A protein has these predicted regions:
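A short, charge-rich alpha-helical start-of-domain segment used by transcription regulators
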Residues: 13-45, 55
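Short amphipathic alpha helix immediately N-terminal
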Residues: 32, 149-183
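Arg/Lys-rich amphipathic alpha helix in sigma70-family domain 2
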Residues: 76, 93-114
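Alpha-helical DNA-recognition elements
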Residues: 201
């Protein structure tokens, strides 16, 4: 590169986004344009080694930079590299790999937008769309939907809505977003403790 970019300084500027968001956005743009080409090949090779295609590698890279914006936690002190640029490249490739695993598992990875579209899930089509079963092979998808329908056919309306909403939004051990719980309580006219009882049944 004709112009040497100080990646560590850019990450610091991104980390100060609460103080100066405009400068942080510019720093992120410069960071992406400088490092994207440097990690692209490595991430594509990783994807191929794990049986994924270029599209998955592309998403993983995009999400890795989203993650840098959300959590600019690079620490040169934790790197075994003495060269800052190489240390950042290795750090980014690790993030991209974890984002790749997340993307292939759930169909989504780190997004910069914090505001999610949180809606109470009332029927099976909504849950199928929300957990990205839509991308599956049609036969596999049909089997999944059939098994799912059988499972929820025995539930009454309140149990069904609670089960489907948790199924769509709950990520490994994490609680549902507070906004969504409020919507669920309002929709069903139940308290949070009543919802917990329903969920256990």
């Amino acid at each position: 590169d004709s112009q040497k970019v100080d990646g560590v300084q850019l990450i610091r500027t991104i980390a100060d986004k609460d103080k100066d968001e405009e400068a942080a956005k510019k720093a992120l743009d410069l960071f992406v344009s400088s490092f994207e080409s440097k990690i692209k090949k490595r991430v594509e090779i990783l994807a191929l080694n794990y049986g994924y295609n270029e599209n998955v590698a592309f998403e993983a890279i995009r999400c890795a930079f989203n993650k840098v914006w959300l959590y600019p936690t690079f620490d040169m002190g934790k790197s075994s590299c003495t060269n800052e640029e190489n240390a950042i490249i290795i750090w980014l490739v690790k993030i991209a790999f974890s984002q790749m695993c997340q993307f292939t598992r759930t169909g989504e990875c780190a997004q910069i937008s914090e505001e999610e579209d949180l809606s109470v899930i009332e029927n099976i089509d909504d849950v199928v769309n929300s957990i990205h079963v839509a991308d599956l092979d049609p036969m596999v998808k049909m089997q999944y939907v059939m098994a799912f329908k059988k499972k929820i056919s025995v539930l009454d309306e309140k149990h069904r809505i609670i089960y489907l909403t948790y199924k769509a939004y709950q990520r490994s051990g994490k609680k549902l977003p507070r906004k969504l719980l409020e919507k669920l309580r309002k929709r069903l006219g139940l308290s949070q403790s009543a919802i917990r009882v329903y969920k256990k049944q």
